[in-house]
Curated annotation (Swiss-Prot):
This is Mediator of RNA polymerase II transcription subunit 19. GO terms for cellular component: mediator complex. It comes from Neurospora crassa (strain ATCC 24698 / 74-OR23-1A / CBS 708.71 / DSM 1257 / FGSC 987). Residues 1-28, 330-341 have a biased composition (Low complexity). The gene is rox3. It is found in: Nucleus. Component of the Mediator complex, a coactivator involved in the regulated transcription of nearly all RNA polymerase II-dependent genes. Mediator functions as a bridge to convey information from gene-specific regulatory proteins to the basal RNA polymerase II transcription machinery. Mediator is recruited to promoters by direct interactions with regulatory proteins and serves as a scaffold for the assembly of a functional preinitiation complex with RNA polymerase II and the general transcription factors.
Amino acid sequence: MSFHPQTPQSPSHFSPSSSDQSTSMSGSIVSTTTTLPTPAHSVNGSSLANDMSFTDIVMGENSPQKRKRTSDDVGDREQKKVHIEDRKLGIDDLHLDVGEKYLLCRSQHQPPRPHLSEDLFEMYGLADLAAEYARIKDGQKNALRKTYKGHIKKLGVQGHFDSVKTDEKDPERLEYLMGCPQEEWNAHFVRGKEITRGLSSDMKSKISRAVTMSRGAVPSTLWNNSVLGDIAASSMKAHLNQPPSARPTAPNTPLAYGGPAMQRVKPQTPGFQDNRPRRNIKKRGYGDSSFEGYGEGFEDDGGLETGYSTGEGDMASGLKRRKKAQPGTQSYAQARQQSSYGHHGVSGI
């Protein structure tokens, strides 16, 4: 019996129990019963049928690698989605009890009212009015089939409501204008009637100046106060000249009292002189007479040994008398005035 070299992926032709260890070659690999069959795509030059038959030969009836369950037996595993959705769904599947629906019918929706299947005339009390104007096939001609003239007369509405029948081919009718071809419409209503043709040459020369906006003063002759909603001066004067009783007032407004205390004070004329008392005191000045009264005070107590004039010493019993000015002496104010004018003031001393 010849032996062929085998790869690790190739199955063995002989079992280790039946082969002789002494006769095996050193380069051969001993296979066991747990060796997996070689896949069909990894064997070059072999067909799928030969591989399947070879697998059946290697795996016996008692091999642990053989599948003992049928193809329909899935065991404890659940069916996949592709196996469930193979069948087509019908109307009966909508009524299957699948438990509580998630987030379904959480809010209550009120049916809209009124429902179109109800009698609206009976619901709103319009049955009598509908019976009056309903068209019933009783062989009689309804007077209101073309116009509501009789009903309008019954209501007492003033005016004429006679319908005027017009010709269907009248070019002034809206239906004729809508069905007019585009070429005919342009020839009759567009061409030669552009809006720019309605403006004269004089108007075209002024329109650019009229629509140009720029800053500037408006002449008084062209100014109109009514544009801004202001009260004109003439109407304001007429309003002021009216007596208070003739002026319109708001409701619940108390009337003005026409007593002497409420009379309006008229503005004084420029030549009018008021008899109010005026101030006679002159303003402060710096002339020769502005220093009067500065030297008419008490003398200083610096040279006295009896104390101050506030009550200490022998002079505490009374106030000092004002010292009378002697003819041969000169007052302090005059001496100060003469000494403040330079050498011209002291030249006479």
